Amino acid sequence: MRYWTLALVLGLAVTITAGCGYHLRGTTDQVPTEMKTMTLNSYDPYGPLTRAVRAELRLNDVTLVDDAQDKNNTLPSLRIVNSSENQVTASVFQDGKTAEYQMTLGVHAQVLMPGEDYYPIDVKVYRSFFDNPLTALAKDAEGDIIRQEMRQQAAQQLVRKLLTVHAAEEADKALDAKLKQQQPPQPVAPAS
């Protein structure tokens, strides 16, 4: 009897998750095919944010090429222009000491498509952090973990926004084609 109940519950769970459109992480194609090979430039090429972005791109099957190999600028380029971390007091204890911080990570990046304009991408990630004055060492370790999670989340958002860049590029191409169709034919000057 237990076996049948367990099988029924498991089968029902699989049916519900499959029917509602739920997909496991990494099973959807987040990066357009035009961007499956690209270059990555950063203001801090070996920093933790750039490493997180590089890892997220590789998780999405993006081949990263060195700038030296793309001398003719024929590949799309993701450029991390800058990032900023900010910490604001969210709540205080009765004695006036900070009880909770709201941490913000902002990332400004650009995608440069070959022969096109650049497309700006801005990402912000927010987290709250409880500041317990009795556990100073644990507080520092927890802050480091939260910052690393924020960088990973910002990298995931950057990769997701590559789809919007692709959609904007396609819309620009469609608009250019429509404008070319609407242009009246140029009069030909009579030959003398």
From Swiss-Prot:
Keyword Signal (UniProt): yes
A GO term, aspect molecular function: lipopolysaccharide binding
Endpoints of the signal sequence: 1-19
Organism superkingdom: Bacteria
Compartments, record wording: Cell outer membrane
GO cellular component assignments: cell outer membrane; transporter complex
Keywords per UniProt: Cell outer membrane, Lipoprotein, Membrane, Palmitate, Signal
GO biological process: Gram-negative-bacterium-type cell outer membrane assembly; lipopolysaccharide transport
Keyword Cytoplasm carried by entry: no
Membrane topology designation: Lipid-anchor
Lipidation feature positions (N-palmitoyl cysteine): 20
Lipidated positions per record (S-diacylglycerol cysteine): 20
InterPro entries in alphabetical order: LPS_assembly_LptE
Assembly: Component of the lipopolysaccharide transport and assembly complex. Interacts with LptD.
Protein task: Together with LptD, is involved in the assembly of lipopolysaccharide (LPS) at the surface of the outer membrane. Required for the proper assembly of LptD. Binds LPS and may serve as the LPS recognition site at the outer membrane.
Family from the record: Belongs to the LptE lipoprotein family.
Record's protein name: LPS-assembly lipoprotein LptE
Source species of the chain: Sodalis glossinidius (strain morsitans)
Gene that produces this protein: lptE
